[in-house]
Design a protein with these regions (language model features):
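Cleavable N-terminal export/targeting peptides
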Residues: 1-45
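Outer-membrane beta-barrel transmembrane domain signature
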Residues: 31, 35-37, 48-62, 70, ...
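N-terminal carbohydrate-binding/catalytic regions of secreted carbohydrate-active enzymes
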Residues: 79
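Conserved beta-strand in the GNAT
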Residues: 91
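Short Lys/Arg-enriched helix C-cap and helix-to-coil transition segments
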Residues: 108
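Extended, low-complexity, charged alpha-helical tracts
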Residues: 111-115
Length: 223
């Protein structure tokens, strides 16, 4: 309960501050899992970093935190995750960023990763996004080829479709497929509400809201 209270206070404070900022009609990418867009000039030579932590409150199971760190320079994309494929399991990734478009902007990053810990394997994966008007689709996925037992190989995916009515707020739907914890659904569905202020993103998710809902609270920082 203390964790939920602290998160609620943080969201309230950021939301009140964000309301005081001027808004525009231009859509802003606020998804915590999005890949930084490719830009021209000197910006392409600079590193950009993003760190996030997802706190999972799973019914009839243990709570856990899933951190992710990304680093991008020019087209190069590097990423590290923990507690994503399985608990007590890390993964390291390398990929290349592609992107383009104006009214319909797109990004796509094919990746290859190594998984180590309680689960070990090789994983081809991807991240991608589409942005149009105030709508954004973000998706990522990977297939883990388990090197200990081929029967444990698995496809993981996470996708979000969100609408940003103002530049600091987004609402939408989310789906995921994971074997990190058990539910009655192979593909979990839910809703999201996110706010952004400067370099900070805060997002709340609820999966399976009609049957033993799982709550996820995410915080992200770009630098």
């Amino acid at each position: 309960m203390r964790l939920l209270a602290l998160i609620a206070v943080a969201i309230f404070l950021v939301a009140n501050t964000a309301r005081a900022q001027p808004t525009t009609n231009a859509p802003v990418s606020t998804a915590t899992n999005s890949t930084p867009a490719l830009t021209g000039g000197a910006d392409e030579k600079a590193w950009s970093f993003y760190a996030s932590a997802y706190t999972y409150l799973v019914p009839d199971s243990r709570e856990y935190v899933q951190p992710t760190f990304t680093a991008d320079r020019d087209g190069l994309h590097l990423e590290a995750r923990y507690n994503y494929e399985a608990l007590n399991t890390g993964s390291a990734w390398a990929g290349y960023n592609f992107g383009g478009g104006e009214k319909l902007a797109w990004e796509f990053t094919p990746m290859l990763g190594g998984v180590f810990g309680d689960t070990t394997g090789i994983a081809p994966g991807y991240k991608g996004s589409l942005r149009w008007w105030k709508l954004e689709l973000d998706t990522e996925g990977e297939y883990v080829f388990d090197t200990r037992s081929s029967s444990d190989s698995f496809f993981y995916t996470w996708s979000e479709l969100s609408l940003a009515p103002v530049d600091w707020l987004r609402i939408g739907a989310v789906v995921q497929r994971t074997k990190l914890y058990k539910t009655d659904f192979d593909i979990q569905r839910g809703f999201l509400v996110g706010i952004s202020f400067k370099r900070v993103d805060l997002t709340a998710y609820v999966f399976n809201p009609d049957d033993k809902p799982t709550f996820v609270f995410a915080v992200g920082l770009s630098f």
